[in-house]
Amino acid sequence: MDNCVIPHGYKATALGIIPQEWEVMLLGNLSNSISSGRNKHRDAHGQYPVFGSTGIIGYSSTYEYEGPVILVARVGANAGTLNFASGQYDVSDNTLIITIKQNVYDYNFAYNQLTHYKLNKLVFGSGQPLITSKQLKNIRSPVPPLAEQRKIAEVLGVWDKAIEKQARLIEKLALRKRALMQRLLSAKLRLPGFSEPWKKVKLGDVAELYQPQTIQSEDLSQTGYPVYGANGLIGYYNNYNHEYPQVVITCRGSSCGTVNFTPGKCWITGNAMVLNVDNNRDVNKSFFYYLISNSSFVNLISGSGQPQIVRQPLLKFELRIPPLKEQTAIAEVLTAADREIDLAKEKLERLRRQKRGLMQQLLTGKKRI
């Protein structure tokens, strides 16, 4: 700090160099209270939302709280997660409630500042992760005058609205694609130029089904060829057992029945069933993936302790498949829909990056409004 040149209008503090008018303050001094919620009951027909560690978790016929508050998940895997509540509501006992002193601290500014702080770094406990009100009260933050807080919150709010709008667009595109899949893959909607009947086949007649060799977890690394298991990508390995992309179904564990499309040159473990159509020239692999992912394998899951799908029932699983040209045309339509969703997701991530960069500048006073 002694070797730093402090710009005009700034000052040195324990948190670094901040604008002269800003003050380093404890969250406890900026809040009227920080305490746990009290609700432990739900009412299916209640009118008041009950907030928990993941947002609204139910409803109640009565409410304990009223007005704006910031909520922080207190315990469990979501400890440190933020939410905002207003109106009349209730809060579960696994959630901390921060009531702000609105004459010195703007709620929207505070929410952004706590988001930027990343509260999950305060979480402790290996068995049951936890964050306490005392920890929150001791958080020190650089705080500008109230008018500047509101201006900063207003600017960040523009990005919030853009992010929310883009997220809604992605939801709409996903719903549209899902509806399109259901109609195209059931032949309820036929593309122009196609009218031939679809054939009913068994999965074992069009694909080779097998579970590859499983590798040990200690053999996985951070580099090499991707390895796909029961939960999708699980690591990397120095070799691959499939040169071309493959359609796979998770056949063990809680995600049993989940369909994935692996890339070429990857290792697929024995926790996944490969549906290999490489040697079937009458099947378009992209179409096959969409068809399988639109199918339900719930009725094939067996085992009470460890859910699993075994090969024999899968071999007999019935599908309806159109001629190859129609398969290709359908795959092209659905691939275009996927690409549209991917582009929308890329834009959403750009907006989020822009907001994070803006927060870094505005919430530290490096950039003034």
Placement of each model-derived feature along the sequence:
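The feature marks the first
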Residues: 121-124, 178-179, 299-302
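Non-catalytic DNA-recognition/assembly elements of restriction-modification systems
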Residues: 8-37, 45-51, 146, 192-213, ...
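Proline-centric
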Residues: 16-21, 96-106, 119-121, 134-153, ...
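Amphipathic alpha-helical coiled-coil/heptad-repeat segments
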Residues: 1-21, 142-199, 320-369
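Structural detector for helix-capping/boundary residues
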Residues: 13, 25, 54, 117, ...
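Short clusters of hydrophobic/aromatic residues that line enzyme substrate/ligand-binding pockets
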Residues: 15, 82, 89, 119, ...
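A short beta-sheet element
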Residues: 52-115, 124-127, 132-136, 229-293, ...
